[in-house]
């Protein structure tokens, strides 16, 4: 699920936001996805 967060400059925001509502975060290109 893409939540509209960029992975640049840091993946930490992506992972942190994904953990709130999902399980984990990963990057595809510069876009954060939660799964």
Curated annotation (Swiss-Prot):
GO cellular component: extracellular region
Protein name per the record: Neurotoxin
Function as written in the Swiss-Prot or TrEMBL entry: Neurotoxin. Decreases the action potential of myelinated nerves in mice and frogs.
Cystines in this chain: 7-27, 14-32, 18-34
Annotated compartments: Secreted
Keywords carried by this UniProt record: Disulfide bond, Neurotoxin, Secreted, Toxin
UniProt organism field: Buthus sp. (strain IY-2001) (Scorpion)
Superkingdom field: Eukaryota
An example molecular function term from Gene Ontology annotations: toxin activity
Tissue expression remark: Expressed by the venom gland.
């Amino acid at each position: 699920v893409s939540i509209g967060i960029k992975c640049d400059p840091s993946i930490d925001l992506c992972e942190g936001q994904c953990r709130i509502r999902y399980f984990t975060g990963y990057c595809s290109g510069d876009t954060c996805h939660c799964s």
